[in-house]
Amino acid sequence: MAAQNEQRPERIKTTPYLEGDVLSSDSGPLLSVFALQEIMQKVRQVQADYMTATREVDFTVPDVQKILDDIKTLAAEQVYKIVKVPNISFRHIVMQSRDRVLRVDTYYEEMSQVGDVITEDEPEKFYSTIIKKVRFIRGKGSFILHDIPTRDHRGMEVAEPEVLGVEFKNVLPVLTAEHRAMIQNALDGSIIENGNVATRDVDVFIGACSEPIYRIYNRLQGYIEAVQLQELRNSIGWLERLGQRKRITYSQEVLTDFRRQDTIWVLALQLPVNPQVVWDVPRSSIANLIMNIATCLPTGEYIAPNPRISSITLTQRITTTGPFAILTGSTPTAQQLNDVRKIYLALMFPGQIILDLKIDPGERMDPAVRMVAGVVGHLLFTAGGRFTNLTQNMARQLDIALNDYLLYMYNTRVQVNYGPTGEPLDFQIGRNQYDCNVFRADFATGTGYNGWATIDVEYRDLAPYVHAQRYIRYCGIDSRELINPTTYGIGMTYHCYNEMLRMLVAAGKDSEAAYFRSMLPFHMVRFARINQIINEDLHSVFSLPDDMFNALLPDLIAGAHQNADPVVLDVSWISLWFAFNRSFEPTHRNEMLEIAPLIESVYASELSVMKVDMRHLSLMQRRFPDVLIQARPSHFWKAVLNDSPEAVKAVMNLSHSHNFINIRDMMRWVMLPSLQPSLKLVLEEEAWAAANDFEDLMLTDQVYMHRDMLPEPRLDDVERFRQEGFYYTNMLEAPPEIDRVVQYTYEIARLQANMGQFRAALRRIMDDDDWVRFGGVLRTVRVKFFDARPPDDILQGLPFSYDTNEKGGLSYATIKYATETTIFYLIYNVEFSNTPDSLVLINPAYTMTKVFINKRIVERVRVRQILAVLNRRFVAYKGKMRIMDITQSLKMGAKLAAPTV
């Protein structure tokens, strides 16, 4: 017997189908992959029709698995970095003086190189530059100090010089011994103090840091010091509730020792996800549906019922002429099995995916197929009450097919009394005169289909996701029941099935009634499985909100189009018979199921960051109208999208909806208040708060035109000249006197250009030693240092561009104010061999551009002031402490197999 058992081939659970002329028996493509292909094909078809007369759009199907992998990678990324020493905030430029140096704030120097040059006619570039500068602030300030280098000095722990944030080593070789000793004494006083933050021992010291960067650092440190213990408890408690709903155990492996005294932990994301953030995205219903399928839908096989059911009910006679008997032995083709997959997708996503019948004029439809489909369609689908699986057209076609089947009297004649309306099923049949009108579709009550006299949507205990509290109960089956396929369904029934059996008996279809009576347990197992999949696996932040779900059916009946229109998939008549004869049996749960909450949180967090960015950018046009003359809301939308992670953009654009988003959609989304709290959002908001002062972004509107001679000092005393540390800059200490400033608006400039007097007017102002300010446009500012005469394009550069040309006998002038402005510092270096007039030229050089920024970017300081900028409090975690990012713990552990699988 053992040998016989070994030789017995493995039982094939899936049903065979014809792929061309080859009989195949594999399970075909995964239902989730197939769903993506079919939904996208339908969406692309509609979009392609819409875009026929307009621009071309790329309609390639996205790789959802790659998108999910990229989002998981995003979850692993840290928005902060752990460093031993902070960035250098101040550096010094050595001059020939022994007691004076130039101190440079490196933040402003580096910020001046970030982004592109702003122009008036490229608002998208302006928005993109602002985003880059804000992200630069966030990136520079998002650091945690850990294991800083220290030394021992007379029993005290003292910070090493590189920890202080000031670079001065290049200054030491030119200092006197007295000055070096003074600096050394100051360094020896940089004592590390022991502190206690959130019951953890830390090092506290005073260092130097630029104001915008320190704001981000301080906000990050406050986020860590707030511990977020309650947020972690809420997240873990919610995960345990979700695990109970989805039959998944929560893994505590990451959290076994995070409460130890030597551990500092950071929670960058939070659960549960605010579903409003995900569903507020414009035109996102199809993308969210695809994400729900990709992250939650299980894999499974299509199981056929016991073949003895049909053999002892439908085909027990030698000759069989009934429609059911004719179709009993048929085998589906690959296309027909694909239609079966569509049917089960529609059953798993009620209301979101609905079915319609294929219109194929070239196909000659067998009446038997239509009749059988009309009967089983009324037992497979729900049409009304609370939701629908069908379009109104398909429901009517099924009613007509059922009407034809009941009137097809192939065994014996049965009495029929027709009604007055001529509608399908408007007759009474049989000796007891069964009224068939009750099987005509009524979307208001669900009469005639599975929702008839059944509570198929229920609200009971609170669900983990607050936006989707509904429980689907096809056929009145409670999804909490455990399913044993060998015994489940025996003795169970529901109203529509009972009425169908009564009507078939009244119509003289006894064999078919016996068949359906025998199929009832198989039928109940089918819908019990579907109920479990919907209420357990598919429960997600991407599930359709209850208010949208409740509005789907009324909107469909009324022909109203809302934010979540259903996806319509086409199926063939015969596929209804094959779907009735097959049940979707889940074999493996989705691989993404346990990590789905983390993916959802990352996605919602990135959406919140994008929304905050767009809110601030939307205010720019009102703050700086001169630089955004041609700006439209679509410009800052595109700028934020371009600087967002590719994975998030791909999810938002899964159905290529970005090609169809309008300004109304966009502005409505930006102004909605919902946000998903996270560390990244906190730092982004703080970065925008720091960026509210545009001078901190190295952008300014205080740019003046003034003719000033480049200094040419006489070198009567070279030693004294070197000690003074002489330098020149076009950076103003204060704005010029207001009564000497001429404000040149675009209108004034255009008027004078039209009169041909623009240059002459400016020359007259320059000769009077006055100042010209060209509008209030923001300009990009760069900082450069020179130890020799700067190039002429910097010295002679004007704060505007003015071009003239002639065409067709007419003169044209182009004036632009938004040009790149350079703040330069010229450091004079002389030698003892220089003569008194070494720096004097016969023809003097002039500078034409002056800039005022109310920030201390560069200043000349004495040596004893080198460490005067040490005024920021830093917290560093000791080297023996562990800094642990527990964000990855926000995922569930092992998936539990269903007790009956």
Swiss-Prot record:
What are its GO cellular component terms?
virion component
Cystine connections: none
UniProt entry tagged with the keyword Iron-sulfur: no
UniProt keywords, alphabetically: Virion
**One term of GO molecular function:** structural molecule activity
What is its subcellular localisation? Virion
SUPFAM superfamilies documented for this protein: Reovirus inner layer core protein p3
Q: Name one Pfam family in it.
A: Orbi_VP3
Query: In which family does this protein belong, per the annotation?
Result: Belongs to the orbivirus VP3 family.
Q: What does this protein do?
A: The VP3 protein is one of the five proteins (with VP1, VP4, VP6 and VP7) which form the inner capsid of the virus.
Know the name of this protein? Core protein VP3
Name of encoding gene? Segment-3
